[in-house]
């Protein structure tokens, strides 16, 4: 019996002019998600999704490439203005922000939403940078 051909789900074009860019930058990777005001995901990308492997994922260049990719996807939906929420201690924070600005977005606000413990759990091994 023949298999049914896999359906290709086509992304419908949403006309959303403003949204929120969530930049999550860890020591190992940088993930960028663009959502609408309610938090529904419009587009996402990461350094690993761009083909970087291992320690190359944590570089600022990899974060820049991920930001350019997610910017292109979001602009297909009519996105023009962004609020940026940056989270995490990684090295891709600034370069992802610059790449989003260079892609033609109007950045209305930048917030650092990195969770800071008030002396909670003991952190993992001491980082040697």
UniProtKB/Swiss-Prot annotation:
Record-linked PANTHER family: 40S RIBOSOMAL PROTEIN S14/30S RIBOSOMAL PROTEIN S11 (PTHR11759)
Subunit structure: Part of the 30S ribosomal subunit. Interacts with proteins S7 and S18. Binds to IF-3.
One GO CC annotation: ribosome
PROSITE patterns xrefs: RIBOSOMAL_S11 (PS00054)
Ribonucleoprotein in keyword set: yes
UniProt keywords, alphabetically: Ribonucleoprotein, Ribosomal protein, RNA-binding, rRNA-binding
Membrane-spanning residues: none
Any Pfam family the entry gives: Ribosomal_S11
Function: Located on the platform of the 30S subunit, it bridges several disparate RNA helices of the 16S rRNA. Forms part of the Shine-Dalgarno cleft in the 70S ribosome.
One GO BP: translation
Keyword Iron-sulfur tagged: no
Stored NCBIfam families: PRK05309.1, uS11_bact
Gene3D superfamilies xref list: Ribosomal protein S11
Name by which UniProt lists this protein: Small ribosomal subunit protein uS11
Molecular function in Gene Ontology: rRNA binding; structural constituent of ribosome
